[in-house]
């Protein structure tokens, strides 16, 4: 819904049905945003029940209440190398269904919009995570249950995406739970005509935890093809060096009306060395925008 030209309100309510499940099987979200030539202000509230089970992987975390707010500005400037600044801040606040905080992420950033079409930026991030179940981040290295406060600084450069070849580079440096982490993310993309785009990505993570050095790298290849202005298909393959997992994703997208889509997705996850299948899925998703 749009009000006063610049105010946009969105919401959804979804539920799942399974034998024996009668409560906590809904998910809902409401958001509002004000966007004009200078200001960008938005917020949302989302709640996902413990028993909400869409079976399609569109929900990252269940049993939570998630609040989010951001405030940003886009003042024009007259400088030799850039024409606009974008200072902004964000906060995510996540609790369980008993309103006990489990995650908090706050950030402040400044982006420079360059005259050649690129973007340069820096961001400072502060995080809090409550870990209920220990998890592994490498061979013989485990993040124990507990509460952790940590943070990082991120710098990035994105070149002009309208060029035949363009790149996106990010650098991360900071703490990671009870350790330290540095990450370099490299993305190189190319475009052939107006239909075909291909992208190669790599993430190199150097983690120091419990006096142990861990290299956790992720590599990916993505290909997008536009058959028409309303029919698109894509393929994505990702390899994780720590888990030795290969994930493949094939997607077909039909835009059947403005902001309304039909998605057909095939997912495959398996161990790269042995080829053993972990899981597979075929997903059909239909969305429809109603103007009231």
Q: Across the structure, where does each feature detected by a protein language model lie?
A:
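Aromatic-lined, polymer-binding surfaces characteristic
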Residues: 1
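Exposed, low-structure sequence patches enriched in small/polar residues
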Residues: 4-7, 11-292
